[in-house]
């Protein structure tokens, strides 16, 4: 350690208590320097956890392969231990906090024997931002330290801001693998028994047994969503599982938009979107603030402002390539930690979907020889890259603005092969909250459950909301009421299929066409037609330059079928029954309003002809 200990009494006392409990061999206070990062990466190489990649192909980058039992978030081992079970709600796992603490104290007793205890002070959000929060993670994993240096602003500069009296969220992590004297360490220490536990009232996090991703990098989902969502409810702001992007128009106007999608719906691709060439040539441009999490607070001018609390990307590698997301590929071209991807013979990385043809031979994520005909994936489906956000070519110049950026629209979307139209704008804030609360997505191979079933994932926050989901809906309703100029709310669905099971919408860069309409709606420039669900673009309101999209196909993308929507509304009921005791009563009325709107419309609502409003005057 290359600096004096901080003089924050609460922090020093907590570190001392943890050291007595966990019994590490030594304590290292992380300073966040490049030298420290390089030394720890070298230590991980010596331990066999890291392999240094080819410096000509991937400068300053490393590959780690985890234990096969430690490859993803463990939702069934994730607990919200609020004082009252009712406050956790039916969508979270709960255990009495007193019982849980006793259990954890038993597990953590002596769990760091033979290891170094690292103290990581970190800031979620730009240093000194009024929206930012400070956390301190104690861990026995150097893998966690180096990932946290990419994912957060960390080290001595954070302690300087914390000062003597500053508040912080204590985050305690251990892989749960103590070493007896002379015992050889494993390349990926972890424990079969795993607990990821949040104590919302005392704002603390305990994680045991896993060294992987969101289970171990406690600033990410644990602090930035589960603890922060509860803090936001108490203090009047929002912590959301949401990307933030900026849209620059040909006139130079900048509009910031947040978008929430469940997993496997293309969130990172959308955050780093590159417009189609005809729209680029007209001067349209997209910039990235963040790809995963947004903290949103009301500003003094009546608008809402958002920051990306993270400092890097923890992206899913499989499926990412230069066609689908060139910005993500550029982001992980150097200074990156790869986890559970495959290794090429020349010490570079590969994963499914990276190239059209796989290499003739690889070493797979479990260290075994791999060939294209061996019948198993080379990279784990949840393989990741950890890359600095500053390396993203589309990064917005204001991505570290401590005030945040002003938000004009929120977009919610899932993966639906039918039912939900390409895009529509909610009639008002409450209607928008309802559409986000009933967000559904068909399960893919990435999620547990039968493929094709619709899983309700309200606001894409189901695994990440740190308190009762119905109270969360109420908080959103109240948040909008308290703002003079709330953002507009939109629904999108890129995944609608035709009768032959083919996607109707091209997606990827062409999503810019929908985004352009959304931005122009917010600015009061774009037309729309009233549908039973909300305001929808007419064919002529969209920019089709460079895309062959017949009117009939567009009508198919935007049609609303009464029978299908009646079934959809019945399935909303399942969620509402689960949350009934605290569900905002407006929701039941809103459901009736949508039903009434469907019955007052044609059985199969579809856009017709080339009708312009001025045509009515003839």
UniProtKB/Swiss-Prot annotation:
Its cofactor is Mn(2+). GTP binds at residues 264-269, 384, 415, 508-511. Pathway: Carbohydrate biosynthesis; gluconeogenesis. Residues 384-393 have a biased composition (Polar residues). PROSITE patterns: PEPCK_GTP. GO terms for biological process: cellular response to glucose stimulus; gluconeogenesis; glycerol biosynthetic process from pyruvate; oxaloacetate metabolic process; propionate catabolic process; response to lipid; response to starvation. Pfam families: PEPCK_GTP, PEPCK_N. Residues 375-397 are annotated as: Disordered. It catalyses: oxaloacetate + GTP = phosphoenolpyruvate + GDP + CO2. One of its GO terms (cellular component) is cytosol. Gene3D superfamilies: 3.90.228.20, Phosphoenolpyruvate Carboxykinase, domain 1, Phosphoenolpyruvate Carboxykinase, domain 2. Mn(2+) binds at residues 221, 241, 292. The active site is at 265. Its main location: cytoplasm. Its EC number is 4.1.1.32. Keywords: Cytoplasm, Decarboxylase, Gluconeogenesis, GTP-binding, Lyase, Manganese, Metal-binding, Nucleotide-binding. Substrate binds at residues 73, 212-214, 263, 382-384. It is an enzyme of class 4 (lyase). It is found in: Cytoplasm. GO terms for molecular function: GTP binding; manganese ion binding; phosphoenolpyruvate carboxykinase (GTP) activity. Binds 1 Mn(2+) ion per subunit. Catalyzes the conversion of oxaloacetate (OAA) to phosphoenolpyruvate (PEP), the rate-limiting step in the metabolic pathway that produces glucose from lactate and other precursors derived from the citric acid cycle. Monomer. Belongs to the phosphoenolpyruvate carboxykinase [GTP] family. This is Phosphoenolpyruvate carboxykinase [GTP]. The gene is pckG.
């Amino acid at each position: 350690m290359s600096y004096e200990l901080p003089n924050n009494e609460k922090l020093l006392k907590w570190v001392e208590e943890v050291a007595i409990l966990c019994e590490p061999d030594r304590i290292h206070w992380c300073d966040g320097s490049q030298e420290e990062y390089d030394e720890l990466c070298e230590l991980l190489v010596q331990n066999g956890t890291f392999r240094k990649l080819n410096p000509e192909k991937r400068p300053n980058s490393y590959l780690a392969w985890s234990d096969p039992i430690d490859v993803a978030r463990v939702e069934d081992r994730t607990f919200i231990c609020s004082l009252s079970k009712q406050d956790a709600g039916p969508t979270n796992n709960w255990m009495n906090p007193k019982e849980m603490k006793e259990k954890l104290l038993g597990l953590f007793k002596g769990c760091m024997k033979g290891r170094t205890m690292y103290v990581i002070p970190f800031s979620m959000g730009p240093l000194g931002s009024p929206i930012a929060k400070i956390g301190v993670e104690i861990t026995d994993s150097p893998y966690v330290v180096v990932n946290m240096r990419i994912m957060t602003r960390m080290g001595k500069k954070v302690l300087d801001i914390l000062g003597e009296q500053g508040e912080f969220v204590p985050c305690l992590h251990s892989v749960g693998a103590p070493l007896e004297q002379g015992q050889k360490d494993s390349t990926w220490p972890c424990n079969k028994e795993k607990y990821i536990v949040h104590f919302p009232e005392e704002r603390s996090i305990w994680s045991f047994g896993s060294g992987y991703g969101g289970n171990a990098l406690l600033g990410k989902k644990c602090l930035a969503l589960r603890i922060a969502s509860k803090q936001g409810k108490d203090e009047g702001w929002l912590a959301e599982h949401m990307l933030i992007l900026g849209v620059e128009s040909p006139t130079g106007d900048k509009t910031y938009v947040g978008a929430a999608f469940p997993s496997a719906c293309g969130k990172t691709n959308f955050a780093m979107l590159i417009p189609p060439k005809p729209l680029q040539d007209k001067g349209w441009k997209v910039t990235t603030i963040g790809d995963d999490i947004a903290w949103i607070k009301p500003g003094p001018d009546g608008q809402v402002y958002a920051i990306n609390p993270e400092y890097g990307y923890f992206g899913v590698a499989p499926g990412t390539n230069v066609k689908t997301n060139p910005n993500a590929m550029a982001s992980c071209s150097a200074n990156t930690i790869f986890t559970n991807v495959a290794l090429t013979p020349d010490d570079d990385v590969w994963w499914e979907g990276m190239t059209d043809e796989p290499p003739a031979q690889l070493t797979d994520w479990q260290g075994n020889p791999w060939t294209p005909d061996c019948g198993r994936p080379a990279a784990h489906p949840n393989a990741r890259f950890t890359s600095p956000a500053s390396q993203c070519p589309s990064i917005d110049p204001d991505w570290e603005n401590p005030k945040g950026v002003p938000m004009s629209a929120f977009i919610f979307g899932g993966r639906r092969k039918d039912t939900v139209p390409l895009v529509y704008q909610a009639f008002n804030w409450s209607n928008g909250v309802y559409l986000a609360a009933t967000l559904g997505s068909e399960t893919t191979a990435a999620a547990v459950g039968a493929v094709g079933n619709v899983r309700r994932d309200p606001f894409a926050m189901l695994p990440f909301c740190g308190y009762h989901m119905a109270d969360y809906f109420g908080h959103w309703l109240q948040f909008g009421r308290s703002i003079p100029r709330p953002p507009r709310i939109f629904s999108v669905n890129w995944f609608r299929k035709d009768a032959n099971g083919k996607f109707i919408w091209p997606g990827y860069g062409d999503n810019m066409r929908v985004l352009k309409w959304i931005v122009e709606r917010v600015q009061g420039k774009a037309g729309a037609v009233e549908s039973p669900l909300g305001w929808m673009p007419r064919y002529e309101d969209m920019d089709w330059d460079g895309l062959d999209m017949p009117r009939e196909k567009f009508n198919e993308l935007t049609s609303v079928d009464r029978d299908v929507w009646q079934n959809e509304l019945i399935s909303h009921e399942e969620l509402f029954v689960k949350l009934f005791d605290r569900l905002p009563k407006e929701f039941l009325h809103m459901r009736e309003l949508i039903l009434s709107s469907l019955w007052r419309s044609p059985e199969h609502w579809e856009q017709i002809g080339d009708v312009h409003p001025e045509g009515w005057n003839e």
